[in-house]
Amino acid sequence: MNKEKIIAVQNLTKQFCSFTAVKSISFDVYKGEIFGFLGANGAGKTTAMKMLIGISKATSGDALVAGFDVKTNTEMVKRSIGYMSQKFSMYDDLTLKENITFFGGIYGLSRNQIKEKTVRLVAELGLEDTIDKLVGSLPLGWKQKLSFSVALLHEPKIVFLDEPTGGVDPITRRQFWEMIYAEANKGTTIFVTTHYMDEAEYCDRVSIMVEGSIEALDTPKNLKAKYNVNSMNEVFLKLARNVE
């Protein structure tokens, strides 16, 4: 694995009044790896991710993303990353082509670049016949695949995926992970949050958050060996019980 750090987090904390959602977490992510940010719903995963991508300010601690300080260089962080939110981020009342054009413009692509990438994107997804249809008419699985592809339009160094397979069927989940693998093989770093513990098996390394803290961080193989279990779900259950 490439040991060049592309994300470096030190004692990152987020408080909402008296409630601490993220409790002084520290970890590194290496260039080109698929890093799983796991935990149950409400564990603090999305809150932590929002701090890393510059849309939420940390209460304390430090983080470098793609070499840029998330506190002082937020705009450069945003230019260096792709982001797919937990909720579908395309516009249902725009066509597929209009959505691609809109987000391509946000990412600063030229008209020619947008045109070229539109042709390639719809071909890769097999959506040539739906390019002029409203995105709202697409099934959820296709919407998720489209969101992922659009997040990569500007060829970011890192793509952040927040619960990307939530609500989709097992076949679509597997297809989505095939897309993730293909992008990682190009050298893109993938930072993915999920509460599906079986998806941890697809990651190079995973961290597991429990009640705002990172309770474990290693490869899936090493974590299963450490806790003497056969699945990542069993690892999570042991960690959760230890916290209780």
Located regions from the model:
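Conserved ABC ATPase signature
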Residues: 93, 134-141
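Conserved ABC ATPase "signature" region
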Residues: 101, 105, 112-130
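Hydrophobic anchor residue at the start of the ABC signature
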Residues: 148
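Conserved catalytic motifs of ABC-family nucleotide-binding domains
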Residues: 155
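Catalytic Walker B motif of ABC-type/P-loop ATPase nucleotide-binding domains
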Residues: 159-163
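ABC ATPase "signature
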Residues: 217-218
